[in-house]
Curated annotation (Swiss-Prot):
InterPro entries xrefs: Alpha/beta_knot_MTases, tRNA_m1G_MeTrfase_C_sf, tRNA_m1G_MeTrfase_TrmD, tRNA_m1G_MTases_N, tRNA_MeTrfase_TRMD/TRM10
Native organism: Tropheryma whipplei (strain Twist) (Whipple's bacillus)
Name the record gives this protein: tRNA (guanine-N(1)-)-methyltransferase
Entry keyword Cytoplasm: yes
Gene: trmD
Family note: Belongs to the RNA methyltransferase TrmD family.
């Protein structure tokens, strides 16, 4: 049975207490995921992991050596080392699907003004590595980004989702956002569920959902809409 291993390295390991809840926690308990958390300070001298930046500037920069020690201790030849970073490649549906087939991912969660750039050069000469960005904004550290990346790809691991068909119609499949969903009651505070969803005609319902996907995607993500239209017409 395929068991993916993910290691998270951070100076705030408490961030990852959430790995024991929801679908990820269930997958972990069922033996589908091997998740391990490491405190970067354990790989440093006297717990010191940062220093002032060469060339001046605000804040502190994380030193390369503790990261190198952690990577050497945790990673193997099969590992992919991921640095969550605004300067990384954009996270996407396709990238999430690709990550789900990895045997071992090591997430290096930086803080402060970033990590000494030499760690990226050093890692790239020894292992497969990648920077990944979850959006055009800056967070206080890489922990939240690492969790978001994990949430995105574990859904593709067989056995994690109770109903695998959920993957087929969710947002970003075929470059379209998801259609609106409704549940009981049929009328809630004067707002009604669209009649077509109560009709029982599955062909019409499928057509309505696709139309709504097109409308929503064109309005909020015209870039995805253009890609979908291009691929459909090709």
């Amino acid at each position: 049975m395929f068991v993916m291993r993910c290691d998270f390295v951070s100076i705030f390991p408490e961030y990852f207490d959430v790995l024991d809840i929801s679908l990820i926690g269930k997958a972990r308990r069922n033996g589908l995921l091997d998740l391990r958390v490491h405190n970067l300070r354990e790989y440093s001298e006297a717990g010191r992991v940062d220093s002032s930046p060469y060339g001046g500037g605000p804040g502190m920069v994380m030193s390369a050596e503790p990261w190198a020690r952690a990577i050497e201790h945790i990673a193997t030849g099969e590992s992919l080392v991921v640095f969550p970073s605004p300067s990384g490649q954009p996270y996407s549906h396709d990238l999430a699907q690709s990550l789900s087939s990895e045997m071992h991912i090591v997430f290096c969660c930086g803080r402060y003004e970033g990590i000494d750039n030499r760690i990226y050069e050093w890692t790239a000469t020894r292992l497969r590595s990648s920077g990944i960005s979850i959006g055009d904004y800056v967070l206080n550290g890489g922990e939240i980004a690492a969790l978001a990346i994990l949430e995105g790809f574990v859904r593709f691991i067989p056995g994690v989702l109770g109903n695998p068909e959920s993957l087929v119609e969710e947002s970003y499949q075929y470059n379209l956002l998801e259609y609106p969903v409704y549940t009981k009651p049929a009328v809630w505070r004067g707002l009604e569920v669209p009649d077509i969803l109560l009709s029982g005609n599955h062909d019409l319902i499928r057509e309505w959902r696709y139309k709504k996907q097109l409308e929503i995607t064109q309005k909020t993500r015209p870039d995805l809409y253009s890609t979908h239209i291009y691929e459909t017409d090709s």
